[in-house]
Each structure stands twice: as structure tokens, then as C-alpha cells.
């Protein structure tokens, strides 16, 4: 079977689509954001049972590239990348443990914690960055004149981009707000030989600058408005279901942040539901002020 994904405008009245190899971050017709869309009709030609068996056979194995818990779901994530262009540190497969005492304190009978930060650079951003940098390598192999990949960051994104570009041998540029990045996060791009710019502004100022730089198609944008990263992060949902023996938790609570990871996890559960693999769950974003967003 030949699976394929593409960029699609999130505006239902527009619905324009673009190749994943197009250097594009917003719809050319209506200027809305884009998401990665999959050919679900083609994916449904395999039964839920067949998908489960395939993913079980790949999970945490050493066969390249499927030992990565992200690329082990390649057909549902980014089938457009040839295996030889995949840039991976065998991300995913993170620990899920039963937090009994914490659950008792919260009044929850069966409380589990998944440590998505157990990754090469110390954050879940690696799950998305493996997809983005692999796609860049794929585009370069097809003749795209990409000279570097760039991002604005307060730490985690820049560390992840630096690591994956170092693995791929692709130059990277990171824009960081001065004195607002931890030493642990700062040392990673510097150690990986990335052009690291410390700017006397906040994150929004860095983001404005990197967007201006990335107007040139030879510098590729790695920030979250590039929806390729969502595809890697949605595998958190796939992995949770697999770790729970193909059962869905009643509730999944995710740190809010900019809601990118919440969106990714929701997309993953929806995709598994559409394939007939799971039932629905309740997904909630939790902010530090204890405000819940359903």
C-alpha cells in the first residue's frame, strides 16, 4: 500500500492542499494555518487488528527506523519520508508508571504518569523534531535549496533542533531571548555547533525575527506554526494506548503551554478512533494556576 500525507488548510471554506515538500507555513489562498492531513481511506484498507499487530511487532525493536516509537508508526505519521532520510535518536518509548501515592493524594484510584521528557534532549520536543528535520533532509535530497533550519525558542525547541540537525549534518540557527534560557538548555545548541543568537528581546521578538529570516525559502522554519512537529508529538497518544494494552485511559491531562502538545495528543487519539482502534477519551489541558480547559 502507498500511503501519503499532505498539508491542508484548516479553514473548511478553503481546504487548499499542498505537498509536504512545499516550503510553506500558511495557506497561500486565505492565510490560515496548515495541518498535516492523511489519506484515511487508504489507511482504513488495513483493519484495526492488522495495525495493532504491525505496531506491536515494531515496538522498541532495533530494526531501523522502527525502533523509534515515532517512526514505528510511520504510515500514520509521515509516510512521505524515505527511510534513508529519517533522522532519529530512537525517540519515544518513554516511561509510563503507576503513581499510587500521588493518586491517593489527589483522590484518584488509578493514576498514571507518562514522562515524555525522558528524551535525547530532555523534552518531548524531540518527538516532533525528528519528523521536521527528516522532512528537511527528504526535501534536500529532492533538490530543495535549504541552507539551514531556524527557530525562536526559550530553550527546549532550540535544544531539540540543534541535536537533530547535528545528527543530520544540517546547519541550524537559533534565536534566544537574552538571560531567559537556562544553562542546561543553552549549552545544547552551543555544544552541537549551532549558530546561537542571544537577543535583547523576549520570545515574541525572537519569533518576529525568525519569521522574517524564514521568508527566504533557503532558511526553513522549525517553530510550532510548522505543523510537521504535531505529527511526531501525536504519537504520545498512540504510545499511551499501546502501553495500556490497547485500552484508552478515562482521562488524559496534559500541561497546557501553547496548546501545541494538547492539539497533537488530541489528533492522535482521533486518528486511532477513526481507524477503529480505540474508543474516545477525555482530554484536558492543565495550567499552573489549576485552570482546566476541556
Language model features with spans:
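PLP-dependent amino-acid enzyme catalytic core
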Residues: 1-283, 290
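Hydrophobic alpha-helical segments, chiefly the membrane-spanning helices
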Residues: 292-294
